[in-house]
């Protein structure tokens, strides 16, 4: 003979009713259909409860947050959790018989106007939308402000760079113009004769000097400038002309001051020989041929 769902078979083969456990307790193992004769009562595990006597198992407590409702009482081993009203922006549907669902659903635009809780929440949302600016608009305004600041900074740096280059260019142009004007002024004050543009180096040779008396200096061309500096005063040979191809003995008219300057420029070391080759007197002019050594330039 088979045992019922609440019976177990004892050692003599008879069907015996399973042990009953009180509230907050359950059997340690399933009992029924001839099995579970050694089961005993234990306390319900956490998050489970049992409110009546019986051999059945403890039931799982309800979670109010899962069904979008406010929890009013916690779950115990003898009682289930108690849930209250729906959370904000949620409502419970009403069935045809007047009963309401246990679970609350979100409010939408299609929610009937009879649901007072959804009507109140939608009005609050509209007021918030008018008072609080959207996050996207704030982000766009911030990005736009940063772009404007970066653009102004870039334009300022570019302007300073261009101004620096322009000032440098103007300074270079003024310097070149000043150098050119200075060169033109020097050329106008000290013109270079065509035959004296280059001055090659000369070896030690014999020079020819021509000395004039002081009474004829007034009519001389070398002293006709009345103290103004001439090109001859800047030459190392002191009135001696420079030859293009070779040293040529040519009479040159010089003053006593030129002779003194030339004599002081000759080095004192070494023997100096003065030999009078020819002395010619032609009127008031005396020509002397004097051998001398010219220092290399």
Swiss-Prot record:
Glycans are attached at residues 74, 77. Disulfide bonds join 3-15, 18-31, 21-41, 44-58, 61-75, 64-83, 86-104, 107-118. Residues 160-297 are cytoplasmic. It comes from the Eukaryota. The chain crosses the membrane at residues 139-159. It is a single-pass type III membrane protein. InterPro entries: TNFR/NGFR_Cys_rich_reg, TNFR_27, TNFRSF27_N, TNR19/27/EDAR. GO terms for cellular component: plasma membrane. TNFR-Cys repeats lie at residues 2-41, 43-83, 85-118. Associates with TRAF1, TRAF3 and TRAF6. This is Tumor necrosis factor receptor superfamily member 27.
